[in-house]
């Protein structure tokens, strides 16, 4: 096996491999465009091919995250991406090879953090080979996704009766949805005003990234257009209005077979219009019309987000579960210190 850096000329082949070999949920995080966005936001990003002879068997994007005292660690968001043709033995060999490579080539990192989009049984034996499994996770381990390959009437029939009722209520109360181009005619001022309402309803807890994050994302990612290719990550801005008044905004990423809801905000005074339910449905319909197979409503977790989880589950759909984090200590003593300090910070907040 061999690991080689990807070059700028490899964008198309990179995205095609990711599209063809990734499960429905989380695919956008290993696209070329997502890496470019993270670069613009200030992250150090590297991309690598894993080959076996003349066969491409895996790819991964490596993002460096700073730690105190000048140290850092490497994070593979929802990666590495493995070829679907690999059997269990070959998958184990790929993980072991990445570990050996990281020890040799990235010794400046304290540890390497993997987040493979695979099921638990695929990595069940990794703990025997110096891989560690943190008891927390970064990306949601569970996502809820609508199957858009079914007829629209069948998708609607799978919704909870209250969800179908809310869709009808939204139309009766004058809710409309427009897909807009963020690079042309969308002002973020409405979105940021509505985030204040959303944060207030969440007991003041802010789950939004800083504005610089959104600025870089909108700067780098192309807007969803009529000729947008599924081989290129793009973003759709779905604006909901009630009687021409801004009521909610959803941002949805499009790539491969999946449209992925990532962020949204809504005006408190318009919540009774059920605009957020209506926005999800119209975004899913847009994705289906464009030939996408899945609409990912995002993470669910009964303990962390009980109300959001209940809301999303009323859409029916498919639930996907992934293994979470796998750490490879490159400097074991510093890795132990990192975990010790992390636990202290957690105790200090509790």
Where do the language-model regions lie?
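Aromatic (often tryptophan-rich) hydrophobic motifs at membrane interfaces
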Residues: 93-100, 213-336
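A short, internal acetyl-CoA/4′-phosphopantetheine-binding micro-motif in the GNAT/acyltransferase core
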Residues: 77-87, 149, 264-273, 301
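Short, high-confidence coil segments that cap the C-terminus of an alpha-helix
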Residues: 43-45, 106-109, 290-292
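A cross-family glycoside hydrolase active-site/sugar-binding cleft signature
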Residues: 77, 112-115, 262, 298
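Active-site/acyl-donor-binding loops of N-acyltransferases
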Residues: 7-11, 64, 128-153, 289-350
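A conserved beta-strand-loop-helix scaffold within acyl/acetyltransferase catalytic domains
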Residues: 6-53, 60-69, 128-137, 150-151, ...
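Glycine-/proline-rich flexible loop or hinge segments
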Residues: 72-85, 106-111
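Acyl-donor-binding surface of acyltransferase catalytic domains
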Residues: 90-176
């Amino acid at each position: 096996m061999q690991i080689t850096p990807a070059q700028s000329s490899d964008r198309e082949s990179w995205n095609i491999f990711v599209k063809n070999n990734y499960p429905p949920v989380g695919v956008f995080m290993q696209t070329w465009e997502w890496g470019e966005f993270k670069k613009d936001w200030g992250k150090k990003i590297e991309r690598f091919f894993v080959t076996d002879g003349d066969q491409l068997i895996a790819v991964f994007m490596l993002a460096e995250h700073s730690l105190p005292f000048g140290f850092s660690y490497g994070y593979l968001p929802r990666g590495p991406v493995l070829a679907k043709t690999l059997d269990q033995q070959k998958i184990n060999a790929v993980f072991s090879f990445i570990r050996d490579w990281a020890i040799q080539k990235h010794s400046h990192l304290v540890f390497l953090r993997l987040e493979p989009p695979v099921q638990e049984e695929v990595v069940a034996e990794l703990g025997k080979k110096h891989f560690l499994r943190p008891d927390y996770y970064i990306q949601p381990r569970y996502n809820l996704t609508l199957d858009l390959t079914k007829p629209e009437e069948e998708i609607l029939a799978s919704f909870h009766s209250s969800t179908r009722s809310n869709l009808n209520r939204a139309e009766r109360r004058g809710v409309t949805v427009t897909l807009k181009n963020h690079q042309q005619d969308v002002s973020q001022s409405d979105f940021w005003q509505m985030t204040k309402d959303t944060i207030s309803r969440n007991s003041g807890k802010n789950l939004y990234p800083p504005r610089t994050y959104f600025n870089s994302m909108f700067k780098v990612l192309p807007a969803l257009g009529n000729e947008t290719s599924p081989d290129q990550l793009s973003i759709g801005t779905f604006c909901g209005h009630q009687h021409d008044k801004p009521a909610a905004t959803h941002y949805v990423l499009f790539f491969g077979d999946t449209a992925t809801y990532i962020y949204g905000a809504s005006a408190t005074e318009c919540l009774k219009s059920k605009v957020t339910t209506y926005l999800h449905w119209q975004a899913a319909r847009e994705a289906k019309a464009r030939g996408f197979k899945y609409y990912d409503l995002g993470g669910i977790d009964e303990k962390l987000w009980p109300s959001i989880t209940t809301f999303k589950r009323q859409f029916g759909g498919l639930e996907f579960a992934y293994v979470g984090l796998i750490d490879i200590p490159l400097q074991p003593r510093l890795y132990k210190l990192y975990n010790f300090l992390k636990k202290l910070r957690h105790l200090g907040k509790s």
